């Protein structure tokens, strides 16, 4: 184990944030002008997630809401896929998803300690209605994190040791009043979503829950091709809540879990959250750049402040006497900010999305605009997209659909192929007279970034390949 003094992470993007965002939102280049400009731009600029996102039309921004993202249809597809992926894994790891309010009274933030320690980052909302009741003229705050709300959910009913560990997940939007000069693309925002999770468990379960969470993190990042991880134990900061004994207990709990995990880890003195120590996970992307993403925080303070408890085994069996204990709270996020993680992933993949995560699965390119070829192209699109239902019917909830477009513009096949490759479609399907006659497809598929192969396939063969790609996370 190595020991380092407190350090600070800096954003890798040094461009003027406002200028870049207005450029992306209002003057974003077309795919072809991007290609021309690429000849003059350094690789670092070409790989910047903002450049790739503009080319692929993933999101836009507005000076009317700085630090917020408008996900366009293709960016929304990626975002939703990441959320769906996590939701599927939550079933394995025992998390129950909940939805919590966006706005809370100042009283809540004072109770949790956020108002005293995080006030500058909380957006205030003033109540000014002329109604004389206990709610009039109250000060509210947009939530910067979900933990106090999850404490309210935990406390909403009496809990027993039989329910523990209790694991909540939440994708609600969060707001933090970041300085305007710090805002940058997807990586630093004022409004964002986090794959937030909180585990309420007994003290005896701490090590197992943390080890299981570390395993979860490693599995997810391995799937995404990010196998290089660094773990940091961030300890008590100068500004904190709770007693020294409570902090020592929490830090020792994380330290023991890290030691038993077998992973290499480093102490990061004084960089914990104000309510508890944490494990920060750093991952390396394809270019060797390190990013802080996942986090695991151990918290004895919020359960104490919210007076959370559970009945023990003795309490359940003691008749009228109820013996109670305070649970431990573990904060955890696998991706962290989903928007920020998307920015990291865009650069890691250089915009070459794997099929299961792709916003553009296939494009059909008719060689001409004759009725015969266009009719077959539309039939192929309907079958491959897996939307073979009448307009009066409903698509089953559990049916996978695929994003298949037709580009029948009056341009040469070569030009349309170049455009589809700039947009990074996974499959290009050329349809001519021969394909219509034989009821086949001429398919070019992308493998290992830009390498491609071309095959003759039936619609059903290609559809089967789509299904296998998603099932295997390819």
Curated annotation (Swiss-Prot):
Gene3D superfamilies membership: Anticodon-binding domain, Bira Bifunctional Protein, Domain 2
SUPFAM superfamilies listed in its UniProt record: Class II aaRS ABD-related, Class II aaRS and biotin synthetases
Keywords assigned by UniProt, alphabetized: Aminoacyl-tRNA synthetase, ATP-binding, Ligase, Mitochondrion, Nucleotide-binding, Protein biosynthesis, Transit peptide
Matches recorded under CDD domains: ThrRS_core
FT transit peptide: 1-27
Any one of the GO BP annotations: mitochondrial translation
Descriptive protein name: Probable threonine--tRNA ligase, mitochondrial
Source species: Schizosaccharomyces pombe (strain 972 / ATCC 24843) (Fission yeast)
């Amino acid at each position: 184990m190595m020991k380092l003094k407190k350090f600070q992470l800096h954003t890798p993007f040094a461009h003027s944030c406002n200028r870049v965002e207005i450029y992306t939102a209002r003057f974003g280049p077309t795919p072809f002008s991007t290609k021309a400009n690429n000849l003059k731009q350094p690789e670092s600029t070409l790989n910047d997630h903002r450049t790739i996102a503009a080319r692929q039309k993933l999101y836009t921004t507005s000076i009317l809401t700085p630090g917020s993202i408008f996900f366009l249809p293709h960016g929304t597809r990626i975002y939703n896929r990441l959320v769906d992926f996590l939701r599927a894994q939550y079933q394995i790891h025992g998390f129950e998803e909940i939805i919590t309010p966006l706005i809370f009274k100042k009283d809540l933030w004072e109770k949790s300690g956020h108002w005293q320690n995080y006030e500058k980052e909380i957006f205030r909302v003033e109540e000014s209605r002329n109604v004389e009741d206990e709610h009039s003229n109250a000060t509210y705050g947009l939530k910067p994190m979900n933990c106090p709300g999850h404490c309210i959910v935990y406390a909403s009913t009496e809990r027993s040791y039989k329910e523990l560990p209790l694991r909540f997940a939440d994708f609600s939007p969060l707001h933090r009043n970041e300085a305007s000069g710090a805002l940058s693309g997807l990586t630093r925002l004022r409004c964002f979503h986090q794959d937030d999770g909180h585990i309420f468990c007994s003290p005896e379960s701490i090590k197992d829950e943390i080890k299981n969470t570390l395993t979860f993190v490693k599995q997810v990042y391995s799937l995404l091709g990010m196998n290089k991880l660094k773990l940091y134990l961030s300890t008590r900061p100068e500004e904190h809540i709770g007693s020294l004994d409570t902090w020592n207990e929490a830090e020792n709990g994380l330290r023991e879990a890290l030691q038993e995990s077998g992973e290499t880890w480093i102490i990061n003195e004084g960089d914990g959250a104000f309510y508890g120590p944490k494990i920060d996970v750093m991952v390396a992307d394809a270019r060797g750049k390190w990013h802080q993403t996942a986090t695991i925080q151990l918290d004895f303070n919020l359960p104490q402040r919210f007076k959370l408890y559970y009945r023990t085994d003795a309490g359940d069996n003691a008749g009228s006497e109820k013996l109670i204990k305070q649970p431990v709270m573990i904060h955890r996020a696998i991706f962290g900010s989903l928007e920020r993680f998307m920015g990291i992933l865009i650069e890691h993949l250089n915009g070459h999305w794997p099929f299961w995560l792709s916003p553009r699965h296939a494009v059909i390119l008719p060689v001409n605009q004759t009725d015969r070829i266009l009719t077959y192209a539309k039939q192929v699109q309907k079958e491959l997209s897996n939307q073979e239902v009448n307009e009066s019917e409903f698509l089953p909830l559990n049916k996978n659909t695929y994003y298949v477009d037709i580009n029948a513009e009056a341009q040469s096949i070569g030009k349309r192929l170049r455009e589809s490759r700039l947009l990074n479609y996974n499959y290009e399907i050329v349809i001519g007279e021969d394909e219509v006659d034989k009821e086949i497809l001429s398919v070019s598929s992308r493998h290992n970034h830009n390498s491609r192969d071309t095959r003759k396939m039936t619609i059903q063969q290609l559809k089967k390949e789509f299904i296998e790609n998603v099932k295997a996370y390819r």
